[in-house]
Amino acid sequence: MSKKYEGPSMMEELWEYVKMIVFVVVIVFIINNVLLINARIPSESMEKTIMTGDRVFGNRLAYMTKDPERFDIVIFKFPDDESQLFIKRVIGLPGETVTIKDGKVYINDSEEPLDDSFVAETPVGDFGPYKVPEGSYFMLGDNRNHSRDSRYWINSFVEKDKILGKAVLRYFPSPKLIK
């Protein structure tokens, strides 16, 4: 007489579920702490590019082998309180001098202002000059008249090692690549 197959025991099946849950938790941990950073936009400082309440993913590996470039949108630790994450656009690069005249941004005494076609409304005001230290960056929001950015911080510059990632995708409320 042959013995009837009964399948795995309840404990064996439970153990398989536990292993699967642990595997998923480890994968999510790796994705969230090594590959991606998840951020919510708390203010209007980046509007019209990214709106208040949007959720974005940043690529944590973007600056492992290269430096941030002008106009990259980055997620970083706020220099005046590193417990807060900010998202802004890179404007001034290491070693440059940034001056803002009548709301227009000039780099190193250039006669031509930077392209600001992404700015929400015509910016106002004069600021600077700001001499960006080596290894640091000068940040501005796209909604310049409503942005708390490098112009107003006690520590005006963001060190490269405080940049956590390059914003690449808005995933809520609807998916959109960030440029």
Predicted regions and their residues:
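Soluble "head" domains of membrane/secretory-pathway proteins
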Residues: 2-15, 30, 34-40, 48-179
